[in-house]
Amino acid sequence: MEQRWGLLRRVQQWSPRPSQTIYRRVEGPQLEHLEEEDREEGAELPAQFCPMELKGPEHLGSCPGRSIPIPWAAAGRKAAPYLVLITLLIFTGAFLLGYVAFRGSCQACGDSVLVVDEDVNPEDSGRTTLYWSDLQAMFLRFLGEGRMEDTIRLTSLRERVAGSARMATLVQDILDKLSRQKLDHVWTDTHYVGLQFPDPAHANTLHWVDADGSVQEQLPLEDPEVYCPYSATGNATGKLVYAHYGRSEDLQDLKAKGVELAGSLLLVRVGITSFAQKVAVAQDFGAQGVLIYPDPSDFSQDPHKPGLSSHQAVYGHVHLGTGDPYTPGFPSFNQTQFPPVESSGLPSIPAQPISADIADQLLRKLTGPVAPQEWKGHLSGSPYRLGPGPDLRLVVNNHRVSTPISNIFACIEGFAEPDHYVVIGAQRDAWGPGAAKSAVGTAILLELVRTFSSMVSNGFRPRRSLLFISWDGGDFGSVGATEWLEGYLSVLHLKAVVYVSLDNSVLGDGKFHAKTSPLLVSLIENILKQVDSPNHSGQTLYEQVALTHPSWDAEVIQPLPMDSSAYSFTAFAGVPAVEFSFMEDDRVYPFLHTKEDTYENLHKMLRGRLPAVVQAVAQLAGQLLIRLSHDHLLPLDFGRYGDVVLRHIGNLNEFSGDLKERGLTLQWVYSARGDYIRAAEKLRKEIYSSERNDERLMRMYNVRIMRVEFYFLSQYVSPADSPFRHIFLGQGDHTLGALVDHLRMLRADGSGAASSRLTAGLGFQESRFRRQLALLTWTLQGAANALSGDVWNIDNNF
């Protein structure tokens, strides 16, 4: 009893102190000594904290300054319920706080990441928690700015035409660098593709000819190495016509002005659309050939910045597609048998790049009406008339060569979901120095490999595998990337989570653009808020945009272009993708796809800010990889596609009256969109109410989320006939864009004009429209059904 009194007195004396609990077993002489200490400490306490003196039932405690008799037994009985209640409250509060903290740790990396040393059994050891701020600091600590600039400079000095002997040397050098990093796998993948090159024995030529076809004057093509890969070969003769950018609307305007396009040679400017699109549109309007030149008005006029030389032509392929056009839909592996077909995107008319100097000579010969003011460029000696001009003959002698190209792969395996890949890639080859075209991307890619390897060595444990790829054949239309996708499509659509492209990432230091799938928009917004602007001190990239534009995404977000490797991942393989780019505020980077795309010109163009801009891109890509590779729940906004569908439905509503007159309706499309939105909302609620530490459940949700993009690939067309099956981004009769183009034929004036290749020369065909509408609707409905999960959760009232 004496021991219990002493302990109770000790609790009473310590009650005003901070809440620190230490348990120590005392008995015998130690307890007597402890009581003596207690009496001494109690004497020093102020009156209001005077402890009870407990000596037995016949004694009462007293305290100087006040007299409150407290019988010891009554005090014990009164204190016991309070002690029990306080204990329960503390236990309950601790349990709730621990539960909330644990759930939070399982969410996005904005909270925390649990990292376990790979050499220790996780069940036998404690866990080391790395928070998002820790991961950011670790990433920035290992990311090296100086190394990237050196790599850009050195890479741009090396010849790296796809399939060349010097490219093989570069491949080996990169493999040697990767072998020095802590990586799980490093390998190469070789494809044998058909690439087109100039014939050194028979150069391409351009001549003025008379009515009989006799040559009057030869126009020298200053650099015989500049050409358009995949151009049709042979002769093309016709009257010259100036056609602005060569868009469909430009050629429509020419027809409206009475300019004859059939049988002509078109002179068009670089920009707005790709070379392949310009040639495809010209072919649809009956032109015989296309000449493409860079007009000075399309590039920066800043006298303090370098400009493109007037004698320099711009390189560009003219295959309206990606990959090897001689094996469409099939991978170009060695010894593989292919059907005797070619891509429908190959042009049937020749095309050739020319310089501004040659274009000036051609424009001076044109007669006919003066071009609209907005069509006029900055060639000082030209009046910019529309034509026609004298007869011109173009001869193209390019030839096809079977060429081996090699992609390089490096992998860090995931620790929880190694069969799910976060992929990042950059083009390695270039026609010319290619500083901005591919040296920047290659430098960032290699630095990210080194950085993440160092992070893993220092405790970072990504849940999913990181796959770093250096592509070959990019200048010929993302050949290396597309052939790899074709070869492993059956695997990749189940395993690839996201693709991040580093191509063309630094073309200036003004505007920032993200060409991306809608699934990544919310994640990009989050990352932009955490990366500093390279040219606005004290601001993040998000603040740089948001302070000057009310809608940040309208300024930053753009659709994926066909000439990007990211396009193949999304439109062909159904993998969400993104490509970042810093651009000039007023004009495009003038040296892209020319021999003047050197490190020196890029450095001058950015006024010495190249290291800062490259660092910003690396931070964007790196933080994106961290989020995608280790968040328990994939940060993909699957609800965004509901807004995309609604936006497209707005275009269809314009024709609802015309359709009603024919007994047709768009109700099925509206219903499918509603089912998709409901499925997305239901999945979101399921995730919100689920246990985040349930690994099996989280994996099930992640599988459904990562396949959303794949759901929008039409299952009703053949990948061999229509490789780009995506109903929003793809090419073909199955797309929503083709459906809208077909609807426009309802109001066509009978002139035979068309707004796209798909509808050129055709009127509205009700049976074709019904088929288009049905296939589109069922693709959208299939996406809604797949997002719903199990078959018993699907709304079958469609």
UniProtKB/Swiss-Prot annotation:
Cytoplasmic side: 1-81
Inducing stimuli: Down-regulated during erythrocyte differentiation. Expression unchanged by cellular iron status.
Segments on the Extracellular side according to the record's topology features: 103-798
GO molecular function: co-receptor binding; transferrin receptor activity
Glycosylation site positions: N235, N334, N535
Gene name of the encoded protein: Tfr2
Organism: Mus musculus
CDD domains: M28_TfR, PA_TfR
Pfam families for this protein: PA, Peptidase_M28
InterPro entries according to UniProt: PA_dom_sf (IPR046450), PA_domain (IPR003137), Peptidase_M28 (IPR007484), Peptidase_M28B (IPR039373), TFR-like_dimer_dom_sf (IPR036757), TfR1/2_PA (IPR037324)
Transmembrane segments: 82-102
Tissue: Predominantly expressed in liver. Also expressed in kidney, spleen, brain, lung, heart and muscle with very low expression in kidney, muscle and heart.
Descriptive protein name: Transferrin receptor protein 2
One term under GO cellular component: membrane
Family: Belongs to the peptidase M28 family. M28B subfamily.
Function: Mediates cellular uptake of transferrin-bound iron in a non-iron dependent manner. May be involved in iron metabolism, hepatocyte function and erythrocyte differentiation.
KW Ribonucleoprotein (keyword) present: no
Keywords: Cell membrane, Cytoplasm, Disulfide bond, Glycoprotein, Membrane, Receptor, Signal-anchor, Transmembrane, Transmembrane helix
Membrane topology annotation: Single-pass type II membrane protein
Localization annotation: Cell membrane
Record GO biological process: cellular response to iron ion; endocytic iron import into cell; intracellular iron ion homeostasis; multicellular organismal-level iron ion homeostasis; positive regulation of endocytosis; positive regulation of peptide hormone secretion; positive regulation of protein maturation; positive regulation of transcription by RNA polymerase II
Chain ranges for the short sequence motif Endocytosis signal as given in the UniProt record: 23-26
